[in-house]
Amino acid sequence: MKTYLVGGAVRDELLGLPVRERDWVVVGATAAQMLDLGYRQVGRDFPVFLHPETHEEHALARTERKTAPGYRGFVVHAEPDVTLEEDLLRRDLTINAMARDEAGGLIDPFNGRADLEARLLRHVSPAFAEDPVRILRVARFAARFAHLGFRVADETRALMRRMVAAGEVDALVPERVWQEMERALGEGSPATFFEVLRDCGALAVLFPEIERLFGVPQPPKYHPEIDTGVHTLMVLTQAARLSADATIRFAALTHDLGKGTTPADILPSHHGHEQRSVDLVHALCDRFRIPNAYRDLAVMVARWHGYSHRALELRPDTVLKALEGLDAFRRPERFEPFLLACEADYRGRTGFEDRPYPQADYLRAAHARCLAISAKDLVNEGLTGKAIGEALHARRVQALKQLKAEWGG
């Protein structure tokens, strides 16, 4: 029985990155032996155990054989006769197929270290094509390591395209797609995830509402980059600069989905795209069972981002209408994420990447001025019933008029 450190821990240590978690492969052991040693079994589909002291995952060395389409159609063989190299062979990328033995020696049968140095994401073997989830994983690793200059190897890109053409991606269940997408949104370069999926054709299959944004023109006066798909990924990149919050990044990604269904005869104008975007956000979230925290912010940004951009030009009563529409008084915790997503949209244009966004500060000030006027104060003044709401509205509008004057409006 021998134990080897495998996968991401070995990769990240060689890259000089913090090791997030340590996974181990055990060769020459049975499940019964692991239990006798005090390990606790947690794997449902194959034998994975938690170490009795460190609680790190230890998996029996295994092989996998494809028996049906999709990512679940596998038969697992995990017996003492499975070698370390056989276990590493079933892994997705060469950079994830390295191990260290108990003495710390590197075991690298598929040249993962060379691919690390060449900054290549390369599949280990043709068996890569048996699991369509690997397409999503490659895209996610590309998003994680983009800042280090990694790219997908040409032969791996070609294999991914063949997998998509063969319909393998169609077998992915929504929850698994969202799981990988959510993780990708948290990576350093989330736009790269969608670029890789687009390159292999998977974006059109999984996220057609994003794919159809590419090639759709916008007015060059406001969008020097012109292409709506290019703009969308620029906005996502800006959102990643502004915040690590994945809900903000998702809202940035989906804020303009309605521009993909703009009638051709009104292009490059996109009149009414906000409501179309809202409808598409709901459909996307329903399809992938995306949590409400993502849906709620994305809908807010899709519907109201134009008001944010025009904040300095709006009448005070219109600013108040927007704040009420955003539910900013009852749900103030969502207001700052909304403003950050709008700032990302403003900056996600060629030549605008580092420009200030004073609209956000203006709306923050407007929100604060309105919050300072409460219904409780009006009740204390003796107002009742409808008069409270009317007075609250009037005083908030007056406060916003004063604010606009202070800002030179």
Curated annotation (Swiss-Prot):
Amino acids binding Mg(2+): 21, 23
Substrates-to-products reaction catalysed: a tRNA precursor + 2 CTP + ATP = a tRNA with a 3' CCA end + 3 diphosphate; a tRNA with a 3' CCA end + 2 CTP + ATP = a tRNA with a 3' CCACCA end + 3 diphosphate
Cofactor note: Magnesium is required for nucleotidyltransferase activity.
GO molecular function, one term: phosphatase activity
GO terms of biological process kind: RNA repair; tRNA 3'-terminal CCA addition
Function, as annotated: Catalyzes the addition and repair of the essential 3'-terminal CCA sequence in tRNAs without using a nucleic acid template. Adds these three nucleotides in the order of C, C, and A to the tRNA nucleotide-73, using CTP and ATP as substrates and producing inorganic pyrophosphate. tRNA 3'-terminal CCA addition is required both for tRNA processing and repair. Also involved in tRNA surveillance by mediating tandem CCA addition to generate a CCACCA at the 3' terminus of unstable tRNAs. While stable tRNAs receive only 3'-terminal CCA, unstable tRNAs are marked with CCACCA and rapidly degraded.
Name of the protein described by the UniProt record: Multifunctional CCA protein
Membrane-spanning segments: none
Statement: the UniProt record of this protein carries the keyword Secreted: no
EC nos: 2.7.7.72, 3.1.3.-, 3.1.4.-
Phylogenetic lineage: Bacteria, Pseudomonadati, Pseudomonadota, Gammaproteobacteria, Chromatiales
Signal peptide: none
CDD domains hit by this protein: HDc, NT_ClassII-CCAase
Family recorded in the similarity comment: Belongs to the tRNA nucleotidyltransferase/poly(A) polymerase family. Bacterial CCA-adding enzyme type 1 subfamily.
Alphabetized InterPro entries for the sequence: CCA_bact, HD/PDEase_dom, HD_domain, NT_sf, PolA_pol_head_dom, PolyA_RNA-bd, tRNA_CCA-adding_enzyme
Gene: cca
Source organism: Thioalkalivibrio sulfidiphilus (strain HL-EbGR7)
Chain sites annotated for binding CTP: 8, 11, 91, 137, 140
Further comment found in the protein's record: A single active site specifically recognizes both ATP and CTP and is responsible for their addition.
